A protein has these predicted regions:
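Histidine-acidic metal/acid-base catalytic patches
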Residues: 1-38, 63, 67, 96, ...
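Hydrophobic faces of well-ordered beta-strands that scaffold small-molecule active sites
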Residues: 5-12, 40-42, 73-78, 114-116, ...
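A short acidic, helix-capping loop that chelates divalent metal ions and anchors anionic groups
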Residues: 16-18, 46-50, 82-88
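Glycine-rich anion/phosphate-binding loops
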Residues: 23-24, 52-60, 87-100
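Catalytic domains of carbohydrate-active enzymes, especially glycoside hydrolases
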Residues: 24-45, 104-112
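Glycine-rich, proline-tolerant flexible connector loops at the mouths of alpha/beta enzymes
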Residues: 41-67
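Residue-level "edge-of-site" marker
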Residues: 45, 50, 78-79, 119, ...
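Active-site acidic/histidine proton-transfer and metal-coordination neighborhood
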Residues: 67-72, 83-163
Length: 163
């Protein structure tokens, strides 16, 4: 049935099993499929070896494994580590570089969308549009407490999203 609702799950839901070695990454994917989910959100900083710079080989293996299992890669969740340096926060250019890197990695693994965090300012979000178009990728932003759609920064982000 073409209009049947499909269910996806964030692999963050399996954090305990993964972090404590109860299930391997592949076992989690197979469990997700066995539980009836069709799509996944991958929290890259948690489950991608070498993140934020995973190997092309690993990304290709992930894509092949998802195809083999029959899971749809829906969302690559990025993490902008503003504290990666001890002497300062990331610059605007560094945030852009990290975000472009996530878009490229997600694309290689077959994910059509990257979800990033609210460390992306409206100014940076606007600057990401050409990269998204070039890569044919979507960039979304996590709305996190205490934010909501009526917060001024979110009003501006939503306007950018509307084009």
């Amino acid at each position: 049935m073409a209009d049947k609702i499909r269910y996806g799950v964030t692999l963050y839901s399996y954090s305990n099993e993964y972090v404590n070695g109860i299930l391997s990454f592949e076992e989690i994917l197979r469990t997700v499929k066995a539980q009836g989910y069709t799509g996944i959100e991958l929290v890259a900083s948690q489950m991608v070896p070498g993140y934020p710079y995973p190997s092309d080989e690993w990304l290709a293996q992930l894509k092949a494994l998802l195809e083999e299992i029959g899971l749809e890669p829906v969302c690559w969740s990025a993490y902008i580590d503003m504290g990666i340096r001890s002497d300062r926060d990331l610059t605007e250019d560094e945030i852009i570089q990290f975000t472009v890197n996530d878009l490229i990695c997600a694309k290689k693994a077959g994910f059509p969308m990257v979800r990033t965090q609210h460390a992306i300012s409206p100014k940076i979000f606007r600057k990401m549009i050409p990269f998204c178009k070039q890569l044919d990728m979507k960039l979304t932003i996590e709305m996190h407490h205490p934010h909501h759609p009526e917060v001024p920064v979110w009003k501006e982000l939503i306007e950018i999203m509307r084009g």
